[in-house]
Amino acid sequence: RQMVSAIRKHDADHLITVGVIPWAQVFPGAKPLFYSPEVARHLDFVSVHFYPKSGEVKKAVDALAVYDIGKPLVVEEVFPLSCSLEELDQFIQQTDDRVDGWISHYFGRTIQEHRQGAEPAGESVAKFLEYWQAKGGRQKQ
């Protein structure tokens, strides 16, 4: 409440959220701070970083459900850091109905620069950026 009041004192227009890392992936059933109605009522939307682990897509899907508290839900950082691109796609497909927005992690280089070996990760980042570019541009109905 104190943080939101301080922001609203200077800016009544911009949306407010608190980004979190997905502790529910590590501790099944863990609830984020904004799960509390006293906290949630002050937020305009919920945001979380999500990095599914290889072989644990269902666990990641189940963990994301904890963050669905009746507010718009944005996965504000996602990347196949610990899973394959195919597993990340499964995660996105299985949760897209409850996620209102997706923002990927970006390394500051073009696809071509990554193809030519830009660090970090080079070719794997190029493949992800191509995937993400192909996924983009969809509007929710």
Regions found by a protein language model. Give the residues of each.
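Extracellular glycoside hydrolase catalytic/binding regions
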Residues: 1-110, 114-129
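Carbohydrate-binding surfaces of carbohydrate-active enzymes
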Residues: 131-141
